[in-house]
Amino acid sequence: MTKDNLPLKTKLAFGIGSTGEAATNWVFSGLVFFYYNQIIGLPGTLTGIGVFIAMMFDAISDPLVGSISDRFKSKYGRRHPFMFFAPIPTSIALICIFYPPDAMSTFGLFTWFLFSTIFLRLSITMFTVPHLALGAELSDDYIERSKVMSFNNIFNYGGWVIMHIFVWIIIFPNYGGDKVGQLVRESYLPIISFTVILVTVCILVSAIFTRDRIPLLKKPSSDLDEFNFKNLFLDIKGALSNKNYQNLLLGLLFLAVLIGTHETLSIYMATFFWELSPIQIGYLVLNNICLLYTSDAADDRM
């Protein structure tokens, strides 16, 4: 860790990693439920249960991966080995989710969906948690750390925009003929191919071009206990006993409900209620970007 100003290269490299994370999350929250329910034919109740179980597992895997990463010792540090490894299982999980075996029973399809989704959440967690921890360790200076996380947020939003434009303006309008593209299974092949490439490139670029900071990062404390589940649950219990953290979690819960509902159901509303064409849905995000800048300018004037 250093108090010196971080080079722009490091900030950009760190930030671009979140584009890969954003692409994965966009596909998961924006397409997976709709794809299994409308294309594959899995009942909505089972699809919802599968997503719910996967997200509950995610709540356990996040602190689990964080605890292991904190104690990990290697010549490549304690964050980068996870960052380098994560694209492999993430890519495999994305392919597994969108290409289940043919002629499966409803229960078999649900089981495949459940375990593939859990696999995806665990895989991207192996990047996300060490990556965020790395961002806090790149500098001792509060301002520098804030700048680093600003780059992270910008690239994260950029990932959502890239995926939205690619899917709704480039891919879906050009598939389906009389049908809208999101209801045609073949249209998802270029989407998953693009996502796998984007995720792999962004995560590896982030890991490769921040590895020169490894010698400057803090090493695991010598008095830190070896990983075990007892210490993990004690750490979780300690965090949950903090009143301020409880309030933060409550706020995040309501925010997650809002975002999850919007991302999962907006494709249904746009397709079946508003009956918008794919390209019309694609233009919605461009309007959001314009509104972001105009509202900021209006706020400055006020």
For each of these PLM feature ranges, what is it?
Residues 2-295, 301:
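Membrane-embedded alpha-helical bundles of multi-pass transporters/translocases
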